[in-house]
Amino acid sequence: HATSTLYEPADFEGELQTMCLRENIVVITYFSLAAGFLTGKYRSAADFAKSARVPGIKKYLNPRGLKILDAVDAVARGCNATPAQVSLAWLMSRPGVTAPIASATNLNQLQEILRATQIGLDAEAMATLDQASA
């Protein structure tokens, strides 16, 4: 298992990714939406009242995290998608990633997550997201 998100791509990329590709090992990532941060619904400390996951989310709310969300928002607007869908589509496009794990607390969230499989990110969108998360 691996955590790999737009916020922390280095958790998987590099030696671990190379070995998984070489050995044909499937990779299923967890915390794929960075405890919900990459859904875009946590943009300030005031938003923490929306979730019991505050300890897991707080670490992402910083200038780097907000820069990543800005890039996700821009790409999402360009492909008529949500930030969660774009974040998952980016992750599913990574070499070696078989499937991301993302939780849903209601049917609407599940439908949103499933639509990520239909999002096609072009080279420009991928470059925007890669640059923001570097």
What are these regions (language model features)?
Residues A134:
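The conserved 3'-phosphoadenosine-5'-phosphosulfate
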Residues H1-Q131:
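Beta/alpha (TIM)-barrel catalytic core signal, keyed to glycine-rich beta->alpha loops juxtaposed to Asp/Glu
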